[in-house]
Amino acid sequence: MTIDLSSMITETRNPASVEIDQLPTLEMLRVINQEDQQVALAVSQLLPEITRAVDAIAAAFGKGGRLVYIGAGTSGRLGILDASECPPTYGVSAEQVVGLIAGGHKAILQAVENAEDDAELGAQDLKNIQFCANDVLVGIAASGRTPYVLGAMAHARAVGATVCSISCNPGSPLAQAADISMVAVVGPEIVTGSSRMKAGTAQKLILNMLSTGAMIRTGKVYGNLMVDVEATNAKLVERQKRIVMEATDCERAVAERALAQADNHCKTAIVMILAGLTADEARTRLQSSNGFISQCTH
């Protein structure tokens, strides 16, 4: 089967870099940097679509649903990267934000031949995690045509879930198959077709906003503090103390005592201090407010 790449912006040559192999290193890097500066501007054009996606994800979380990223190659790895950071940062289970990649775990470290061309595999990978109508799927593919991702999106639509897409070529099959389509038009890559570069950077920026925005909307952030952070290493133990001190304007000893009484749960310690409650009382109040600290202290 012949694939026509001529209409894909991500596959065209970039006039700014046609002689990049002849440039001194500093000039070469300057060209790359100048092109990278276009990425955030391209993503800024998508804020209305990203808003819709964030609100859909937050609503799914409220119903016990999950956020599932799916992609092949770099796109799949970026989804896994974003998903893997959610449990330590926001204290959610590893099942709440899931990243799937064509070819499975082996494909995280090395290419798996032909995996991205299997549409049925994409659907099967969703079936394997019991993907359902309460979940949200985000299909990621710079080209906008990856069969593995399209197969997953078709299955997600069939079960009644909200389907989003992140791509970099306007009018692609991926964009057309989504309820919410986020198309970051970043232009041709510095190295023709190397969509791990500008396209990958755009995907990462959007993924950052999707997960962060949904976590903020569901009470995982107080002010700009990650109040559900888990103390899984020495740095994060210290961060917890600083968060409690910042959130309550208390002394270090007060924060340490509250955290000890709260079994090292930041939110509980903060509510204890702000509302003058015991640990059990703070937990009860947090539960009744769906985890929103701001609703516990008024």
From Swiss-Prot:
Function field: Specifically catalyzes the cleavage of the D-lactyl ether substituent of MurNAc 6-phosphate, producing GlcNAc 6-phosphate and D-lactate. Together with AnmK, is also required for the utilization of anhydro-N-acetylmuramic acid (anhMurNAc) either imported from the medium or derived from its own cell wall murein, and thus plays a role in cell wall recycling.
UniProt domain SIS: residue ranges: 57-220
MF (Gene Ontology): carbohydrate derivative binding; carbon-oxygen lyase activity; ether hydrolase activity
Taxonomic lineage of the native organism: Bacteria, Pseudomonadati, Pseudomonadota, Gammaproteobacteria, Aeromonadales
Reaction it catalyzes: N-acetyl-D-muramate 6-phosphate + H2O = N-acetyl-D-glucosamine 6-phosphate + (R)-lactate
Record keywords: Carbohydrate metabolism, Lyase
Example of a GO biological process term: amino sugar catabolic process
Disulfide bond positions: none
Summary of subunit composition and partner proteins: Homodimer.
Enzyme Commission number, as recorded: 4.2.1.126
SUPFAM superfamilies for this protein: SIS domain
The protein's name in its UniProt record: N-acetylmuramic acid 6-phosphate etherase
Organism: Aeromonas hydrophila subsp. hydrophila (strain ATCC 7966 / DSM 30187 / BCRC 13018 / CCUG 14551 / JCM 1027 / KCTC 2358 / NCIMB 9240 / NCTC 8049)
UniProt-listed HAMAP family: MurQ
Broadest EC class assigned to this enzyme: lyase
Other remarks in the entry: A lyase-type mechanism (elimination/hydration) is suggested for the cleavage of the lactyl ether bond of MurNAc 6-phosphate, with the formation of an alpha,beta-unsaturated aldehyde intermediate with (E)-stereochemistry, followed by the syn addition of water to give product.
Pathway: Amino-sugar metabolism; 1,6-anhydro-N-acetylmuramate degradation; Amino-sugar metabolism; N-acetylmuramate degradation; Cell wall biogenesis; peptidoglycan recycling
InterPro entries per record: Etherase_MurQ, Glucokinase_regulatory_CS, MURQ/GCKR, SIS_dom, SIS_dom_sf
